[in-house]
Amino acid sequence: MMKQEITIQIPEGLEARPVALLVQVASQYGSEIYVESDSKKVNAKSIMGMMTLGLFAGETVTVSADGEDEEEAIANIEKFLSSK
């Protein structure tokens, strides 16, 4: 299992379109991937779960992945969340 703290730099935060794109990125991997903010932890492959977090630019989340491609998964999710 691998964990990484990532600061969201997408200007509009995680609204519907960026969430859909993030779910597409996460769904490319076989690993179990979760995003955690405060006390909420949701499956990164779930649009509804991700929408419940209501994340904004500048917020920091913890992304965890467990599986054969966990390193690549976290690296690409970090790249996506850090894009401006």
Per-segment meaning from a language model:
Residues M1-E5, T60-T62:
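Intrinsic-disorder/low-complexity, polar/charged segments enriched in Ser/Thr/Lys/Arg/Asp/Glu/Gln
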Residues K3-T7, A20, A26, N76, ...:
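Generic alpha-helical hydrophobic packing signal
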Residues T7-A57:
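Compact, glycine-rich, soluble single-domain proteins
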Residues M51-K84:
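C-terminal structural segments of small proteins and small subunits
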